[in-house]
Amino acid sequence: MRGAGPSPRHSPRALRPDPGPAMSFFRRKVKGKEQEKTLDVKSTKASVAVHSPQKSTKNHALLEAAGPSHVAINAISANMDSFSSSRTATLKKQPSHMEAAHFGDLGRSCLDYQTQETKSSLSKTLEQVLRDTVVLPYFLQFMELRRMEHLVKFWLEAESFHSTTWSRIRAHSLNTVKQSSLAEPVSPSKRHETPASSVTEALDRRLGDSSSAPLLVTQSEGTDLSSRTQNPQNHLLLSQEGHSARSLHREVARTGSHQIPTDSQDSSSRLAVGSRNSCSSPLRELSEKLMKSIEQDAVNTFTKYISPDAAKPIPITEAMRNDIIAKICGEDGQVDPNCFVLAQAVVFSAMEQEHFSEFLRSHHFCKYQIEVLTSGTVYLADILFCESALFYFSEYMEKEDAVNILQFWLAADNFQSQLAAKKGQYDGQEAQNDAMILYDKYFSLQATHPLGFDDVVRLEIESNICREGGPLPNCFTTPLRQAWTTMEKVFLPGFLSSNLYYKYLNDLIHSVRGDEFLGGNVSLAAHGSVCLPEESHSGGSDGSTAQSSVKKASIKILKNFDEAIIVDAASLDPESLYQRTYAGKMSFGRVSDLGQFIRESEPEPDVKKSKGFMFSQAMKKWVQGNTDEAQEELAWKIAKMIVSDVMQQAHHDQPLEKSTKL
């Protein structure tokens, strides 16, 4: 396996070959351990040097900086640094087949492609919405229209309470360890020994108990918990801790610099314990305030959302409410950080089942999608993992004669996802048959839709498919990376500047505009009955009627505008001219000069009229009276006279030479 590149550090041994990132990582780790050993040796030498009265003043500064709390904090920091370094090295580690290589027409491989981490910003789950600060305001607006915003606010406050409570408990445990280490009397035989290891072990045990709970970081908007900013308190706690540690070192320096009797040593030790207790009292008070703030936040959340007297209580059972009360008012006087977890699950399920699907179809989510699409940072994952965007992208790829690349990526990614979901419990022969379908279509020498993969990739796919036990879930990883890179580097920039992309945006904007007008009418109907006390009923009704008429007029104008600019393709069909939907029976005849249709063929005399026709004629006579042919002839004569008079006035100089025959 080749290294990712040369080491960024400059050393005198630059001519030596680079050992790779793994060796450089181990070298840094060993160097860090050597520095820690050097610090431990220096601190031990400083503690031993206290016995000599000549060096007491010189080592006074070393004593102030070598307290047990300082060593414990250094140990924690070293562990965190080593963990972060190892994690960074693991993330940067790449197998040999992930090296950058050129794929000809398909471009260069994408080293950052990881299918399990790809997700679209345009399609969200409820958990992603609650943790995303961009889409969360839109979800809050949607829930406010439904008068269910208290569900979202409770979930956010409970999540923030859960995370901050665990951080406060860790800070309280750290302060307790420091107080116990400061208040412990020092024996004459172990007066000059540094209890760094014991403090570190006790701290690890205490923090290990609370590390089982996940520390969730949630950025909630609108939460008003009493004391959520614990950074100033922690800073003050650390400063008090350093002050108490320095007082302890001064006391040790005074008592250890001279040889005094045993009684004097006992009295000085009692004096040191008293001074340490007095110095640790502010630390204890701040720690108590920290724990009281946890209780206060829990009570505030319970009063706002869980109490039966709350303005908008969340939908939970009485048994669950009693369980929350028992966890807040524990027997040991401590608040359980997980007291709201069950209520959170109930609220989450209610939002997901009753509201979230409607939110995804609302104009609020369309507004969020428009914000993402117009932000200027649209990635390929946003397009491929969103159904609506994928539809327009597939049309663009079809116009570019590259739809086979997209179809291969979708099919191969779906195949690998299904195999990975089965976790090794799948039929190898069946999986091999499915993989051979993709191979015959895109990779073989007789492929129906060849994509241009070279022989190296084809041989790799053959070896991955034709293996004992069936193909692995990552058998198409290399061509998937190639197809992903090609779409990302070659086709995505063109799509983002194409007419299809702007059509997609236009469709979203039109849907938002129409839904806003419809939503305005719904909200107006919902709030129209609510009037202010000083307003009369008639005034409120008139105002609501006027507003509704304005809304309807706006909708009518909008619809007319949309209909005016949209050309129906069906209206351009020439065959539609010969379609006479409401035409009756065909008959032969002619049209006179007056526009009268004169039948030339009489109906068959032997055909009897149907009962329906006879009934209609009877009803016509009963309603309109007697309509015989004489009256109809008279009407046509009157019409003829009117037409003749008009013609004579128009052509007064020319006599009427011929008359119109009826």
UniProtKB/Swiss-Prot annotation:
Major location (coarse): mitochondrion
Secretion signal span: none
SUPFAM superfamilies referenced in this protein's UniProt entry, alphabetically: Regulator of G-protein signaling, RGS
Membrane-spanning segments: none
Subcellular location as annotated: Mitochondrion; Membrane; Cytoplasm
Transit peptide: 1-28
GO MF annotation terms: protein kinase A binding
Keyword Lipid biosynthesis: no
Tissue specificity annotation: Highly expressed in testis, kidney and lung, followed by brain, skeletal muscle, liver, spleen and heart. Also expressed in brown adipose tissue and pancreas.
SMART domains, sorted: RGS (SM00315)
Stated name of the protein: A-kinase anchor protein 10, mitochondrial
Coiled coil: none
Biased composition (Polar residues): 256-280
